[in-house]
């Protein structure tokens, strides 16, 4: 009997994620049943601290991030460890904090995060823009710089979150790279090229 058939049901194996040292991913992790994973300002701050710990532990680089009320987006560059180890550390540590604070039982996040391997330079830039425009698309703010819980303010030098790696992104733009990147993101004529359905499970 086929090992994938158990009790008359077919067990479908999950496709392994493509990975290699230095691989860059667009990652999206959502709260289970689209429930809130951030309820107040402290939650966002704690998540950022846990993100810092995970980045340091697995020597990853974050090129862009955005924390929405019920999901997160990351543009992440790996090092010598497969992406799953980083995501496990990040999600489990935050879930422990959240469940303890709110006396919540059960899973906080959907069982499997979504990911898309970013290989082309153009897709890297589109993904960075897409992530930073999430709060605008959701009509939370008019301008991406007005949203506190993303890396955009750091990218355009309004603050330094000591997390975001700006150099790779800004290197695509020559003179006045910060201004040119800002124009690239906030260009009202652009379209949201990167769509959520393109982020594979």
Give names to the regions the model predicted:
Residues 71:
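Short acidic-rich active-site patches of cyclic nucleotide enzymes
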Residues 1-64, 68, 77-201:
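Short Pro-Cys-Gly-centered "Cys-loop" motif that presents a nucleophilic cysteine in a tight turn
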């Amino acid at each position: 009997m086929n090992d994938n058939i158990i009790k008359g049901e077919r067990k479908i194996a999950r496709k392994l994620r493509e990975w290699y040292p230095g691989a860059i991913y667009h990652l999206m992790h959502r709260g289970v049943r689209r429930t809130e994973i951030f309820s107040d300002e402290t939650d966002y701050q704690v998540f950022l601290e846990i993100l810092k710990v995970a980045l340091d532990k697995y020597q990853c680089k974050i090129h862009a991030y955005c924390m929405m009320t019920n999901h997160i987006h990351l543009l992440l560059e790996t090092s010598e460890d497969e992406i799953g180890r980083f995501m496990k550390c990040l999600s489990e540590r935050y879930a422990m904090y959240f469940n303890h604070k709110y006396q919540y039982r059960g899973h906080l996040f959907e069982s499997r995060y979504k990911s898309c391997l970013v290989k082309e330079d153009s897709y890297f830039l589109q993904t960075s823009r897409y992530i930073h425009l999430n709060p605008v698309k959701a009509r939370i703010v008019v301008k991406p710089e007005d949203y506190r819980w993303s890396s955009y303010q750091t990218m355009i030098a309004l603050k330094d979150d000591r997390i975001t790696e700006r150099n790779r992104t800004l290197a695509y733009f020559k003179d006045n790279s910060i201004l040119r990147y800002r124009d690239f993101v906030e260009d009202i004529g652009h379209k949201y090229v990167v769509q959520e359905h393109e982020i594979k499970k």
